[in-house]
Swiss-Prot record:
Its EC number is 6.1.1.7. It comes from Lactobacillus helveticus (strain DPC 4571). It catalyses: tRNA(Ala) + L-alanine + ATP = L-alanyl-tRNA(Ala) + AMP + diphosphate. Its main location: cytoplasm. Its cofactor is Zn(2+). The gene is alaS. This is Alanine--tRNA ligase. CDD domains: AlaRS_core (cd00673). InterPro entries: aa-tRNA-synth_II/BPL/LPL (IPR045864), Ala-tRNA-lgiase_IIc (IPR002318), Ala-tRNA-ligase_IIc_anticod-bd (IPR018162), Ala-tRNA-synth_IIc_core (IPR018165), Ala-tRNA-synth_IIc_N (IPR018164), Ala-tRNA_ligase (IPR050058), Ala_tRNA_ligase_euk/bac (IPR023033), DHHA1_dom (IPR003156). Consists of three domains; the N-terminal catalytic domain, the editing domain and the C-terminal C-Ala domain. The editing domain removes incorrectly charged amino acids, while the C-Ala domain, along with tRNA(Ala), serves as a bridge to cooperatively bring together the editing and aminoacylation centers thus stimulating deacylation of misacylated tRNAs.
Length: 879
């Protein structure tokens, strides 16, 4: 067995499958693109969906990759087991309708056992197969796996609902009984059982069926292979490490953490060792997630990052580390992974800054959470069972970021218990809600056989406004290939076309199709890419169309011009944002429309007005510099050497198109562009807003639309000038300032008069003193304007010692308000204003709270105020 570093092992896997004709696919971003079913990329196959469902046909049907992945469904187990991680790498080899089990199994055996490759002892390897999958058992035995090392398990069938599915085979490594956590005669002590002896290292899925909505299974027209090998698991074998955490991927991080403590060492005791593991795992996850564009927040991916950072910091405190420390480990992570993943070191400063800022913010959250936890402990001490409820513990976890363990330990120190079952039930309910929210989107989708079978070559004539005479090659109506279309709608493929198909954020061209006599036969309403890369024209038919005939294709030239302006301006905007905000700014999405453009990007804070102005000025400067727009067809590798930005998941073919605008902007792009930036004319940002946690959006217009926008603003300015009676536009601000000053003076006069009126009313109100038991009460619905006036009356009441209890209510704009104040005599009797207001507020459709001596509430049913006042007096009378 070879002793390999993580870098050597990763490269060996990729080289092995490259030697077997596979294309090495770079790791995709951890943030999924165009896949709402995933929060994170969580496996290698997650990036292959478009190939397996047939929506895209890859250049090479054999693919291999080492994919960054994050899984967060069981964060609480990280650090407590040998293998649980949030961030990990999944090695995989994939076949899209090419080879199948007769190749996949022998290759796996060769890579694992051949002295040229890993050289694992054959006697240590076992596999599991689906009982009905006799073919896999046959191929395994032929490859060299002993029959008594092949275990049949019903679980070996991969099926996630509607879509591709099939049997799978899992490979296990026998680590020996000395490494087991169950007895040798335990019924779970077998490959595939719940034990620590047999380590699962590789899974091969034979995706040969389609699971239909009606529950039936049918053969797929194209059978696929999907495999996954956990890099860290196999590395623990190659490096003779007891767990994943003793490999060269984790130990440098753990040693760096040790140096930050007051002498604590990894492995000395269980509690500290768990803390070291959690910190090492979590800093890897957050470093790569931030490098790929995620930022801490209160929802979605951002919430996961926030939770990981806080959990790591809490365990740092347990190790005696004071203050922010996690950010200091980022360069350690970057150095370990740099050979294959340079992004962490490339963005080191930004990642450190994000983590450090989040760590600093956590102290305030920690203080608040600890205060609330103290309240829960006091509450539990007064309860009969001396237990913090599972609901309260989950609230501490879900709302304030307190892991269950911290709540449990604090309760234990106070001699209390925590309802773990209740907590688990709340956690499971949340997971179930999330699962149901995604619903049927979990399916990978059925293969579209009709479109996949269209193999005719179609050429996109990108930069022409000519009207080509194109031959109609294929017609699809109601998901079937036909020779003639004579209904309302059809989908068409031509041998050549000037129509751009929607991709990369740019919407499709529209236009018309004419016959050879110049008669309109169809309107093109949309254009999309077929699996084999033809442009699919979705049309509304005017006249019948026949396969094999020639037609004249005319795009909407005005629409195309608008798209060219918007797309080139989008590239300039992206470059300007990176220059003004920093190169850590990631594009997170875009829309290129003929009327406007939309650009989403990662950012921790809103842009300032100065930043927006700087970006806008920089884009216009580049427009007016009249820079030639140059396009180059090259390889992805050469494109990167040219400095071109590769966006999103980095899935490119053998050739890419690089669009350059001088030395200011260079990107991989397949869209349509101006030939010179001056054709854009003018660029105007019309909005900058939030679209989610850590995500901002700019909307902008160009050319004619920018002129129309500015003309409308100018007209609006003229209207304002007339309304405020300014002599010229330059005087508008001064005129508005003067009007605001006059308004402020008038408001002060109104407030003074209102105060006088309220004082007069107070005299009348405070004269009406009632008796409730042995307490004096002033209680009425006052004729005042809402809560502010009620507070002012309450302040007057305090200074006058007019009664023991004050209950005032008011109606304003259909809303109900109430305030209760208690004097010392009422307080001495044990009355609390907060308790009283909570009890009666529902009577007028509201809720509220406050201190023992004063509380307030608002509601939606003012007609209930008198009944609420009566209820307060009744409660007081009981005392």
């Amino acid at each position: 067995m070879k002793k390999l570093t993580s870098s050597e092992f990763r490269q060996m896997f990729l080289d092995f499958f490259k030697d077997h004709g596979h294309m090495i696919m770079p790791s995709a971003s951890l943030i999924p693109q165009d896949d709402p079913t995933l929060l994170w990329i969580n496996s290698g196959v997650a990036t292959m969906k478009k190939y397996f469902d047939g929506s895209v046909v890859p250049k090479n049907h054999r693919i291999t990759s080492s994919q960054k992945s994050i899984r967060t469904n069981d964060i609480e187990n990280v650090g407590k087991t040998a293998r649980h991680q949030t961030f990990f790498e999944m090695l995989g080899n994939f076949s899209v309708g090419d080879y199948f089990r007769d190749e996949a199994i022998p290759w796996a055996w060769e890579f694992l056992t051949s002295p040229k490759w890993l050289g694992l002892p054959k006697e240590k390897l076992y596999c599991t197969v689906y009982p009905k999958d006799v073919d896999s058992q046959r191929v395994w035995e032929k490859a060299g796996m002993p029959a008594d090392h092949i275990v049949k398990l019903e679980d070996n069938f991969w099926d996630i609902g509607e879509g591709p599915c099939g049997p799978d085979t899992e490979i296990f490594y026998d680590r020996g009984q000395e490494n087991n956590d169950v007895a040798e005669d335990d019924p779970e002590n077998f490959p595939g059982g719940e034990n620590a002896r047999y380590l699962e290292i590789w899974n091969i899925v034979f995706s040969q069926y389609n699971h239909l909505p009606n529950g039936k299974y049918v053969d797929q027209p194209h059978k696929n292979i999907d495999t996954g090998m956990g890099l860290e698991r196999v590395l623990s074998i190659l490096q003779d490490a007891p767990t994943n955490f003793e490999t060269d991927l984790f130990l440098p991080i753990i040693h760096a953490t040790e140096e930050m403590t007051d002498g604590k060492k990894y492995g000395e005791n269980k509690e500290d060792t768990t803390a070291f593991k959690i910190i090492a795992d979590h800093v890897r996850a957050v470093s790569f997630a931030i490098a790929d564009g995620a930022l801490p927040s209160n929802s979605g991916r951002g919430y996961v990052l926030r939770r990981l950072i806080r959990r790591a910091d809490l365990h740092g405190q347990r190790l005696g580390i004071k203050g922010a420390f996690l950010y200091k480990l980022v360069p350690v992570v970057g150095k370990i992974m740099q050979s294959h993943y340079p992004e962490v070191m490339d963005q080191r400063g930004f990642i450190e800054n994000v983590i450090q800022n989040e760590e600093k913010r956590f102290q305030a959250t920690l203080d608040t959470g600890l205060t609330l936890l103290d309240d829960l402990i006091d509450k539990a001490k007064k309860s009969d069972d001396k237990t913090i409820s599972g609901k309260d513990a989950f609230k501490m976890f879900d709302t304030y970021g307190f892991p269950y363990e911290l709540t449990f330990e604090s309760a234990q120190d106070a001699g209390l218990k925590v309802d773990k079952k209740g907590f688990d039930a709340e956690m499971q309910a949340q997971k179930e809600r999330a699962r149901k929210a995604r619903g049927d989107l979990q399916s990978m989708g059925r293969q579209d056989v009709t479109l996949m079978n269209i193999k005719d070559k179609s050429v996109f004539e990108r930069d022409t406004y000519e009207e080509p005479h194109a031959k109609l090659l294929d017609i699809v109506v109601d998901d079937k290939l036909v020779d003639k279309a004579d209904g309302e709608h059809a989908t068409l493929v031509f041998d050549k076309t000037p129509f751009y198909a929607e991709r990369g954020g740019q919407v499709a061209d529209h236009g018309n199709i004419y016959d050879q006599d110049g008669e309109l036969v169809a309107k093109v309403t949309d254009v999309q890419h077929a699996p084999n890369n033809q442009n699919l024209h979705f049309v509304d038919l005017i006249l019948p169309m026949e396969k094999g005939k020639e037609y004249v294709l005319k795009i909407d030239k005005e629409r195309r011009e608008g798209l060219r302006h918007s797309h080139s301006a989008t590239h300039l905007l992206h470059a300007a944002l990176r220059q003004v905000l920093g190169e850590h700014t990631h594009q997170a999405g875009s829309l290129v429309d003929p009327d406007y453009l939309r650009f989403d990007f990662t950012a921790m804070e809103p842009m300032t007005p100065r930043e927006i102005k700087s970006v806008e000025e920089l884009v216009n400067q580049k427009i007016w510099e009249a820079i030639d727009v140059k396009t180059t067809i090259t390889t992805p590798e050469e494109g990167e050497k040219m400095g071109a930005l590769a966006l999103f998941d980095g899935k490119y073919g053998d050739k890419v198109r690089v669009v350059q605008m001088g030395d200011f902007s260079s990107e991989f792009c397949g869209g349509t562009h101006c030939s010179n930036t001056n054709q854009i004319g003018i660029f105007k940002i019309i909005s900058e807003s939030a679209v989610g946690a850590g995500m901002r959006r700019i909307e902008a217009v160009t050319s004619k639309k920018a002129y129309e926008y500015l003309a409308n603003r100018s007209s609006l300015l003229d209207d304002i000038q007339a309304d405020v009676k300014a002599t010229k536009p330059d005087n508008i601000i001064d005129k508005i300032d003067s009007l605001e000053s006059d308004l402020h003076d008038s408001q002060k006069q109104v407030e003074a008069l209102t105060k006088q009126i309220n004082q007069a009313k107070a005299g009348q109100i405070f004269d009406d003193v009632k008796q409730a038991g042995d307490l004096t009460v002033i209680a009425t619905v006052a004729d005042v304007n809402g809560m502010n006036d009620l507070r002012e009356l309450a302040d007057n009441w305090k200074s006058g010692n007019k009664s023991d209890v004050l209950v005032l209510a008011a109606e304003n704009d259909g809303k109900a308000n109430m305030i209760i104040s208690l004097g010392q005599k009422a307080l001495d009797k044990g009355l609390k204003a907060g308790d009283l207001i909570k009890k009666v507020a529902p009577i007028f459709g509201g809720g509220g709270g406050g201190r023992p001596n004063m509380a307030q509430a608002g509601g939606k049913r003012p007609e209930g105020l008198n009944d609420a006042i009566k209820a307060v007096i009744e409660e007081i009378s009981k005392n």
